[in-house]
């Protein structure tokens, strides 16, 4: 494989010295960019865009042409695994993702196959290989998956949810069925991420978007336990280099210590967690990624720079920080504000690295 020219993102995840704090943005390939909208229109719909390796590669590279980002992230969706299990993923205008055949009981779980990443999910691996080739070693490529709990919420609820009553009913009334589903998903995610790593992903991230809706006890049992299983099963070295793993539970700031015990390399923080506090608690074990409120990108560039300075000062001197937003970038953010954010991180962070 091509020699990596900019490895500061990988180095920061492993708490190794860097010249400036690396930065990328969750959903950096997305609807805030006019060129993304044009490519998506060309593809026809969202899943067609995900399934076309050349177009998925194009949208992955678009933000890198605009901004000096320190990593690319695979353009895909967390719901590829449930889709490959046969649940019939479709997107309803204004509704988000839906499934034609949601999981309602243990019998449904028993019927679910564990998808072969190079077969039913081969289009994702083709995209990874294409992106790695086209990146030409400029920056590392991040692969990702949803967490078992988060995937299960969509599969059991039949789509997006605000109250999560359907999956919580299963969790409390038929926990055995839910554990069977989560176990199957943990196996599927492990295979899927390992296939991404073999195809060329240089780091992987597990997005636990809905872990924060659980009680602490339920989080340990129904979300973290299965993420820990995945981390245990991941390829941690490929192509002669360590493959760092980041866990991100949105709303999970109270559980950082438990998350750091999984053996992951880094934790993602949302904007509700104080980064100085997070570093005091777990900075000796893991790197931290985050954590500016994505809505800050609506502010004037001078205010964005102030916020970047505050977060950098909060983390403080030394290694182990990857700058990011606390969740995905909003679709109506002015692209030049995202540019001001990226520039500010690089310009203001050099003083923290000796």
UniProtKB/Swiss-Prot annotation:
It comes from the Bacteria. Pathway: Porphyrin-containing compound metabolism; protoporphyrin-IX biosynthesis; coproporphyrinogen-III from 5-aminolevulinate: step 4/4. The keyword Cytoplasm applies. GO terms for cellular component: cytosol. It is found in: Cytoplasm. One of its GO terms (biological process) is protoporphyrinogen IX biosynthetic process from glutamate. Its main location: cytoplasm. Its EC number is 4.1.1.37. GO terms for molecular function: uroporphyrinogen decarboxylase activity. Substrate binds at residues 27-31, 77, 154, 209, 327. It is an enzyme of class 4 (lyase). Catalyzes the decarboxylation of four acetate groups of uroporphyrinogen-III to yield coproporphyrinogen-III. Homodimer. This is Uroporphyrinogen decarboxylase. The gene is hemE.
């Amino acid at each position: 494989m091509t020699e990596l020219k900019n490895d500061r993102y990988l180095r920061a995840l492993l708490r190794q010295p860097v010249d400036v704090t690396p930065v990328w943005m969750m959903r950096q390939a997305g609807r805030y960019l006019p060129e993304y909208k044009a490519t998506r229109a060309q593809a026809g719909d969202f899943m067609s865009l995900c399934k076309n390796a050349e177009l998925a590669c194009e949208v992955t590279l678009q933000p890198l042409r605009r901004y000096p980002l320190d990593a690319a992230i695979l353009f895909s969706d967390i719901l590829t695994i449930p889709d490959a299990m046969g649940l019939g993923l479709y997107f309803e205008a204004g509704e988000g993702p839906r499934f034609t055949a949601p999981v309602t009981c243990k019998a449904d779980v028993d019927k679910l196959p564990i998808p072969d990443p190079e077969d039913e999910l081969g289009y994702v691996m083709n995209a990874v290989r294409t992106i790695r080739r086209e990146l030409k070693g400029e920056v590392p490529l991040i692969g990702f998956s949803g967490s078992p709990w988060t995937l299960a919420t969509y599969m059991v609820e039949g789509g997006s949810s605000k109250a999560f009553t359907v999956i919580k009913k299963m969790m409390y009334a038929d926990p055995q069925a839910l554990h069977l589903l989560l176990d199957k998903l943990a196996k599927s995610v492990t295979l899927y991420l390992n296939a991404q790593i073999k195809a060329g992903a240089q780091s992987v991230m597990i997005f636990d978007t809905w872990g924060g809706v659980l009680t602490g006890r339920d989080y340990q049992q129904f979300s973290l336990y299965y993420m820990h299983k995945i981390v245990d099963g991941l390829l941690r070295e490929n192509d002669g280099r360590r493959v760092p793993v980041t866990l991100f539970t949105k709303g999970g700031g109270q559980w950082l210590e438990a998350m750091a015990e999984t053996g992951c390399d880094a934790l993602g923080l949302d904007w509700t967690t104080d980064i100085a506090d997070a570093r005091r608690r777990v900075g000796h074990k893991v790197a931290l990624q985050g954590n500016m409120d994505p809505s800050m990108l609506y502010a004037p560039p001078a205010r964005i720079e102030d916020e970047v300075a505050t977060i950098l000062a909060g983390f403080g001197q030394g290694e182990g920080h990857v700058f990011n937003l606390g969740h995905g970038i909003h679709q109506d953010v002015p692209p030049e504000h995202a540019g001001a954010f990226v520039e500010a991180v690089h310009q203001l962070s050099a003083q923290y690295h000796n």
